[in-house]
């Protein structure tokens, strides 16, 4: 009965706030702070009404809450009681709900209250002050508040006494100085007297200024709030052990807080005196929740301008303050790096006790990602100009690189990550990454059902790994040269393979392709993929022989065997394959057949003529095959055998022509080859293909049939299915649509324009840097399939024979045709003499050579990733989508006006 009545009075107090202007000294605030804030939609509605109807009361309430935090970490720092900490937790919970409501409005309320210290005037309705406080029930928290007010008065008296004593000490020192000056020589007496009088006058003016500043504090309320939150994260007795001392660490170390105040040891600090307990984790959680809401201003900014948006909150914590940077960075990293949900491997251990370390680990990763992502672009001319010539694009890239080199990053956290060089820290982070990434896979494939809790930190941690790899090249090198470096790809590629099945999980596919693109630019990483495959996979594919087989198999499934076509990653995935191909050895027959099926899929007229830029996909794949033939011919005889068996497809492309009568088929009718499971089936499929030196003529009837009748699957999508999907998104913008479930990954969408080769968002000269003469462009983020189809219907691209002959000159097909014409007669003669024995053919190919066939073997070309405004805005949207989806209890951002991405209710 008591709790129900107190809850009613609590709600009644909010109703009073919505009707009348309440002064700062009113007892009504005691009633509001006397009860914990429950996760109830009523409180959220009341806070929104308070913001809209009585903004002056909300501003007073915010000042009241911030003053409580300042009081706990300031005046009564050494005399806090458990009741004071309880009141602090209540204040933190209120602030974490109020800040998103303040940010979503987009008005000047936040600037006036938090940064300008201006008062909020009431709205048009008349204001009335409360004369008598409402009757409240006697609770523990109200008694705490009354005791706290008494303590405040006592503390003020103590401070006044200290100030009087300090003034007396200063007067004594001045008198001593005067006595010493009188003992000097008579010649200098006049000079010394003048200097003493001037110093006395300046001291008096300084004292007057200090008294004026003490009477009117000009520090922004946001700075007080952020400084209090950072102090509470390392507050002895609240979040760390009391053995560190209750006095402020700024007295002993004014430059930076000692790293011993970190929560855990491991990264950056070997050991810390703090021992974890449940209450520490609860207090840390409340502070972290309030901190992430302070940094959530980007959620309420449109994605078009988020890459250049400057947040005062993020500017202060990443640039202005330096005192807590190292300790905060170490604490956030070590919190999730030391998290081990499996532990000793006791089954069903998560049912015996609740682990608060898990929630803090998730928030720590998310706050770390927010801090490391904030680096607003200074100049606005970051969009790729695709209408310019190639030399103009190179000049534009050089200017951008010079500007990036001259403009230093202001973010202290990014600067610290870039300067890390300790190998021990790299190994510690990498081992934690491998362990946490494997937890969901282990939990989903245990012999005892639900014996291991499925901790899903892999999405946040994958993004953190991307940030570390992109910022610190030494860390990238250490990962590449690690003794078991390719093993961390096993969970990553499995998540990518699972993510392709649903549109809500395409985000993990995108971030995985970025990581692979970054790694593929390193020669040592490409060579390490030739190691024998040692690991356990849980997806429905054959056990790979080497890591290269595993990578190509997953890439094949991403491009071909996907319900919703991920056309935006086509060029990125094929670029990865092109970077890795010069170093791949001993590819299995299954992998070689998949490469041939992929070439068949991309080179069919139905796919090739769909848009005027699809030929580039064929060019990347042909470049990869050329690299394998030129640089790894002796170790890839299976690939040569597969090329000879599928030479008909290369001949078709070489002699392809377009007659004026030939219509272009819609993309919905493109057939996809199905995955091949065993090497025996691969040999069987290849044996069914005919070897012929004569080019086959093309017709529409033959192009509708595949070389292998039962090996392709139809991926046609009905028009009714396309029309049934909602298309309420704004075109020509990039948006993220989080699903309504907690486990789903947000879908990052972009939309093609009517001319994909000119206006569609691409990762072109600004995104992928290459040494080739032709700029390579990557379209990012992924367009939804229904919008791509609409674009094709609007653009009405009709290929001509002149266009076809022009693009065929750009395709590197000559070397493969030379190999076919050189080896095909020899293989035919061998088959007619002794029969078609695969083993004899393979032995013969091992003895063969292609010396003299390639006149000008091209150099190894590597394309690297470079950031631009489009990809940067996509990363920010993807990061905040994950944060939004995983913070539902308590609901920090639910039912607020999110502008960064679209929320489907």
UniProtKB/Swiss-Prot annotation:
Gene symbol of the encoding locus: hid1
UniProt feature coiled coil, ranges: 139-191
UniProt record similarity statement: Belongs to the hid-1 family.
Keywords: Coiled coil
Biased composition (Low complexity): 192-210, 395-404
Regions of compositional bias (Basic and acidic residues) in chain numbering: 147-191, 701-718
A Gene Ontology term for the protein's cellular component: Golgi medial cisterna
Region named Disordered: 147-217, 381-404, 690-793
Compositionally biased region (Polar residues): 690-700, 719-760
Coiled coil is among the record's keywords: yes
Chaperone listed as a keyword: no
Organism: Dictyostelium discoideum
Name of the protein this chain belongs to: Protein HID1
């Amino acid at each position: 009965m008591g709790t129900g009545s107190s809850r009613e009075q609590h709600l009644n107090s909010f109703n009073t706030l919505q009707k009348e202007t309440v002064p700062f000294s009113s007892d009504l605030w005691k009633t509001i702070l006397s009860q914990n804030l429950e996760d109830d939609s009523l409180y959220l509605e009341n806070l929104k009404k308070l913001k809209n109807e009585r903004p002056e009361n909300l501003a007073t309430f915010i000042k009241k809450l911030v003053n409580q935090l300042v009081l706990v970490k300031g005046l009564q720092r050494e005399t806090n009681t458990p009741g004071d900490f309880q009141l602090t937790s209540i204040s933190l919970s209120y602030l974490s709900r109020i800040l998103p409501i303040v940010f979503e409005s987009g008005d000047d309320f936040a600037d006036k209250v938090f940064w300008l210290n201006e008062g909020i005037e009431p709205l048009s309705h008349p204001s009335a002050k409360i004369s008598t406080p409402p009757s409240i029930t006697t609770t523990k928290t109200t008694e705490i508040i009354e005791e706290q007010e008494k303590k405040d008065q006592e503390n003020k008296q103590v401070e006044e006494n200290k100030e009087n004593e300090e003034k007396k000490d200063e007067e004594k020192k001045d008198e001593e100085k005067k006595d010493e000056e009188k003992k000097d020589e008579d010649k200098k007496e006049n000079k010394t007297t003048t200097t003493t009088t001037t110093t006395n006058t300046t001291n008096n003016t300084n004292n007057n200024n200090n008294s004026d500043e003490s009477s009117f504090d000009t520090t922004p309320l946001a700075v007080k709030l952020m400084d209090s939150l950072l102090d509470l994260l390392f507050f002895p007795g609240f979040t760390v052990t009391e053995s560190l001392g209750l006095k402020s660490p700024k007295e002993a170390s004014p430059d930076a807080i000692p790293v011993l105040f970190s929560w855990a040891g491991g990264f950056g600090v070997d050991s810390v005196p703090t021992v974890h307990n449940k209450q520490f984790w609860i207090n840390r959680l409340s502070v972290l929740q309030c901190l992430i809401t302070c940094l959530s201003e980007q959620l309420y900014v449109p994605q078009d301008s988020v890459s250049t948006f400057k947040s005062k909150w993020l500017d202060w914590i990443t640039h202005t303050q330096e005192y807590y940077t190292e300790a905060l960075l170490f604490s956030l990293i070590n919190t999730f790096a030391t998290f081990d949900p499996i532990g000793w491997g006791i089954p069903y251990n998560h049912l015996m006790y609740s682990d608060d370390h898990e929630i803090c680990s998730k928030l720590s990763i998310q706050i770390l990602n927010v801090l490391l992502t904030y680096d607003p672009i200074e100049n606005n001319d970051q969009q790729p100009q695709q209408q310019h010539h190639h030399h103009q694009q190179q000049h534009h890239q050089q200017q951008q690189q010079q500007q990036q080199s001259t403009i230093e990053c202001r973010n202290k956290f990014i600067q610290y990550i870039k300067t890390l060089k300790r190998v021990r820290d790299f190994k510690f982070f990498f081992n934690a990454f491998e362990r946490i990434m494997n937890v969901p896979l282990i939990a989903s494939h245990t012999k005892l059902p639900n014996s291991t809790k499925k901790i899903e930190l892999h999405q946040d941690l994958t993004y953190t790994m991307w940030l570390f790899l992109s910022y610190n090249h030494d860390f990238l090198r250490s990962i590449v040269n690690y003794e078991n470096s390719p093993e961390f790809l096993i969970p990553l590629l499995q998540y990518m393979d699972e993510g392709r099945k649903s549109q809500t999980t395409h985000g993990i596919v995108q971030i995985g392709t970025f990581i692979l693109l970054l790694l593929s630019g390193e020669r040592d990483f490409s060579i390490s993929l030739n190691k024998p495959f040692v690991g356990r996979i849980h997806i429905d594919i054959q056990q790979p022989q080497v890591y290269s087989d595993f990578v190509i198999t997953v890439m094949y499934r991403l491009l071909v065997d996907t319900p919703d076509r991920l056309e935006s990653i086509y060029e990125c995935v094929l670029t990865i394959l092109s970077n890795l191909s010069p170093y791949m050895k001993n590819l299995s027959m299954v992998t070689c057949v998949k490469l041939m099926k992929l070439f068949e899929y991309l080179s069919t007229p139905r796919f090739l003529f769909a848009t005027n830029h699809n030929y580039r996909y064929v060019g990347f794949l042909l470049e990869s095959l050329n690299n394998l033939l030129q640089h790894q011919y002796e170790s890839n005889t299976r690939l040569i055998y597969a090329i000879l068996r599928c030479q008909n497809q290369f001949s078709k492309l070489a002699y392809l022509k377009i007659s004026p009568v030939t219509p272009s088929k819609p993309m919905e009718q493109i057939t996809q080859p199905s995955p091949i499971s065993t090497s025996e089936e691969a040999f069987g499929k290849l044996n069914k293909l005919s070897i012929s030196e004569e080019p086959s003529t093309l017709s529409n009837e033959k192009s509708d049939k595949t070389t292998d009748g039962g090996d392709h699957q139809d991926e046609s999508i009905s028009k009714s299915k396309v029309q049934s999907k909602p298309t309420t998104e704004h075109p020509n913008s990039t948006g993220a649509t989080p699903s309504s479930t907690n486990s789903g990954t947000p879908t990052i969408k972009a939309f093609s324009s009517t001319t994909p080769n000119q206006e569609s968002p691409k990762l072109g000269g600004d995104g992928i840097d290459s040494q080739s003469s032709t700029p390579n462009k990557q379209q990012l983020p992924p367009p939804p399939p229904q919008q791509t189809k609409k674009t094709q219907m609007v653009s009405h691209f009709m290929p001509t024979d002149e266009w076809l002959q022009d693009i065929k000159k750009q395709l590197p097909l000559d070397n493969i045709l030379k190999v076919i014409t050189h080896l095909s007669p020899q293989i035919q003669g061998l088959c007619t003499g002794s029969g078609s024995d695969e083993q004899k053919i393979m032995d013969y190919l091992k003895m063969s050579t292609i010396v003299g066939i390639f006149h000008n073997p091209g150099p190894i070309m590597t394309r690297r990733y470079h950031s631009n405004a489009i990809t940067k805005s996509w990363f920010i949207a993807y990061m905040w989508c994950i944060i939004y989806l995983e913070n539902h209890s308590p609901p920090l951002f639910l039912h607020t006006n999110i502008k960064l991405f679209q929320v489907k209710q």
